[in-house]
C-alpha cells in the first residue's frame, strides 16, 4: 500500500495544482467518481484486455462519470495518461491523496467516529464540535456503529486515535490487573 501511495502522490499533487486554478470541489467530485469507476473489477478487466484500445478505455471511463469536468481537456489528459501507463488501479489512492491535499488547504480533516450505538443529529453535532476544539481544525465526520465497543466512541483523525470505548477501558484494566 505504501508503494501505491508513493506512485500516486505525484499524480495527486499535479492534479491538485490544476484544480487550484479552477474549482477544487468540482475536481474533487471528478476524481472521486473516476476512483469509484476504477474500483470496478469489470473496468479493470476491460482496461487490461488487448482487444480494447486505450482510447476506448479512456472513453469508457469518462462516459461513466457524471461530473461536468469530464469534457475538460486536462481531465481527458489525466485519464489518458493513467490508461496509457497502466495506472488505473492508482485512481482510488489518487483520490484519497487529493482529498488530503484539499483538506490541508481548507484546514480540515476527515474523522472516523466509531460508536457502540447510532449517533443522532444533536449528539453527533456536539461530539464533532468538541472534537474540533480538541484537534483545532474543522472535521468532516464519518460515523460507523460497532456494538463490540460496548459503550463510548473511538475517534480516528489522520494517524491519531482517541479511544474512550468501554472495551478499551476494560482492556486497560485487564492489562493493569495482570501486570
Curated annotation (Swiss-Prot):
One of its GO terms (molecular function) is proton-transporting ATP synthase activity, rotational mechanism. Disulfide bonds: none annotated. It is a peripheral membrane protein. Gene3D superfamilies: N-terminal domain of the delta subunit of the F1F0-ATP synthase. GO terms for cellular component: plasma membrane; proton-transporting ATP synthase complex. It is found in: Cell inner membrane. Pfam families: OSCP. Keywords: ATP synthesis, Cell inner membrane, Cell membrane, CF(1), Hydrogen ion transport, Ion transport, Membrane, Transport. NCBIfam families: ATP_synt_delta (TIGR01145), PRK05758.2-2 (NF004402). F-type ATPases have 2 components, F(1) - the catalytic core - and F(0) - the membrane proton channel. F(1) has five subunits: alpha(3), beta(3), gamma(1), delta(1), epsilon(1). F(0) has three main subunits: a(1), b(2) and c(10-14). The alpha and beta chains form an alternating ring which encloses part of the gamma chain. F(1) is attached to F(0) by a central stalk formed by the gamma and epsilon chains, while a peripheral stalk is formed by the delta and b chains. F(1)F(0) ATP synthase produces ATP from ADP in the presence of a proton or sodium gradient. F-type ATPases consist of two structural domains, F(1) containing the extramembraneous catalytic core and F(0) containing the membrane proton channel, linked together by a central stalk and a peripheral stalk. During catalysis, ATP synthesis in the catalytic domain of F(1) is coupled via a rotary mechanism of the central stalk subunits to proton translocation. Belongs to the ATPase delta chain family. This is ATP synthase subunit delta.
